[in-house]
Swiss-Prot record:
This is Probable protein-export membrane protein SecG. It comes from Ureaplasma parvum serovar 3 (strain ATCC 700970). Belongs to the SecG family. Signal peptide: none annotated. One of its GO terms (cellular component) is plasma membrane. InterPro entries: SecG. The chain crosses the membrane at residues 1-21, 50-70. One of its GO terms (molecular function) is protein-transporting ATPase activity.
Length: 74
């Protein structure tokens, strides 16, 4: 039950960050999740909070995937 709540909170947080980044630049937000190149680690004009939020959203997504994999294995 606690794991479900954690995953829901992480998903909502990632969605909010993605929506905040959607309008900031063509390389950010949810547009990078639809099969195009993920431009987090490429040189772009994004600096400061935008780049930090992009990296945080990417890491949050990886953490959620790992939690689901470990939960299914055990």
């Amino acid at each position: 039950m606690a794991l479900t709540i954690v995953l829901i909170l992480f998903s909502v947080l990632a969605l909010i960050i993605g929506l905040l980044l959607s309008r900031t630049s063509p390389s950010g937000g949810l547009s990078s999740l639809n099969g195009q190149d993920l431009e987090i680690f490429k040189k772009t004009k994004d600096r400061g909070w935008i780049k930090g939020l992009q990296v945080f959203m990417f890491l949050l997504t990886i953490v959620m995937i790992l939690i689901i994999i470990f939960y299914r294995v055990s």
